[in-house]
Amino acid sequence: ATSGPGATNLVTGLADALIDSTPVVCITGQVFAHLLGTDAFQETDVVNTTIPVTKWNIQVTEAKDIAPAVAKAFYIAASGRPGPVLIDITKNAQNELIEEPEYVKCDQIRTYKPKPALQMDAVEAAAALINGAKRPYILAGQGILLSGASEELLRFSEKTGIPVACTLLGLGCFPTDHPNYVGFLGMHGNYGPNVNTNECDVLIGIGLRFDDRVTGNVSRYAKQARIIHIDIDKAEISKIVKTEVAIHADAREALEALIGYCRPKQHPEWIESFRKLNQIEYNKVIHREFNPSEKLTMGEVINHLSLLTRGEAIVVTDVGQHQMVTSRYYAFKNPRTNVTSGGAGTMGFALPAAMGASLGAPDKQVVAVIGDGGYQMTVQELGTIMQYKIPVKILVLNNSFLGMVRQWQQLFHEKRYSFTEMTNPDFVKLAQAYDIPARKVEDRDQLQQALKEMLDAKGPYFLEAVVGKEDNVFPMVPAGGCVSDVLLEPPAKK
């Protein structure tokens, strides 16, 4: 980015990357070194500005230091718990001519220990708890994906018979069609995984932060459980929930060790309890969404998308109702196919992120699923899509509201709608102005054909699906509630 406003515009993206453990290397321009501190044109102290939102940053004022800084930046960003780094380079350093820089090896940085040694006493203690458990439960987070441990998680679950639920960022790390998979956990997660959090006797959290979207009211969270927490970042262990056994390690190494120490076992009745609870959700929520009487629903749009892509597309979601619906109804079959803004909840994320996913995985189908509110926050990126002919498919679920905020205003604030209703442009004409083929679908009998047309397009394509204005997303955890307090329908009026 350029100096000044170009650099400060990176802050939200860096914050998003930091909390979601995304490796990013940002290079910013800066004024001449002799002008630093003089409030020169487009001078901002970007290094101090970005300290809270980066894993590491540095300012380079001499050309000889550029190569070591770049090598160190890429190493730090991608190792350990990944995260964003920033290099700020002054104008004079950019203008200097230097000889070919030498290769810089950065695998030994003083005080930086990206991969902790596995402590076998902790593994043995965890295995003892697991072997004695009657109702064990695995919560699988993004750390599984970051360590490449999906296969190890599958082997561990199959050997021990332990049910697996995924967090928002963990989706895709475990096959959704596996009998041990019990669903998506959290604020708008499936009924079974949420309710049974307070029924398990051993809870195994792997590569997750136990943040508020996963726990709800932490004082009442998993009260019957003895908790095992596996994470590469020591700062996350016991930060929110009290951990009985902490395994500070790479998830893949920890799971490999646990597979060796844990005894073969099955828990059919325990897994069946998840199925029964999820059936209650189906009867009250999913059945209604898949058998609608009037407008298209978000659930049926995403279900059709999942079926047509066989769960194999890279799906990039924005933030809001559509994000939660996609997490519940899209059957992510493969690791690293679910891309979303989980911790920061950054509206406008999906369109630029989908562009990056498409460029990074050119052999994969990439679909950006976006609400009409978030879409307009970065809609200018249609110009980039047009310029570089990026074949991303854009699916906007249009309910003419900032739907998630409206849902809370409706359910808990007596429909006092404030700044949530949208006045939208003609999205089809807007896409066409960028020379992107576009279509709008409102009728149920045209939905499948419209989605197929979008997916079959050789280049970029825009599809607007008009859904019910006041459709709500259930299950949901009410404010102040624990995840086990999850609601399947609007709360009764007092």
Can you describe what each PLM-predicted range is?
Residues 1-266, 304, 308-311, 391-394, ...:
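N-terminal alpha/beta PP-like core and its mobile active-site loop of ThDP/TPP-dependent enzymes
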Residues 27, 35, 41-42, 237-240, ...:
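Thiamine diphosphate
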Residues 82-85, 265-278, 462:
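Flexible, glycine/charged-enriched surface loops at secondary-structure junctions
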Residues 86, 229, 316, 369-370:
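Generic enzyme active-site microenvironment
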Residues 88, 316-318, 464:
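Short beta-strand segments
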Residues 141-145, 291, 371-373:
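Conserved short loop/turn motifs at secondary-structure junctions
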Residues 202, 314, 365-367:
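Structural motif
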Residues 277-352, 357-358:
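Active-site diphosphate/adenylate-binding microenvironment
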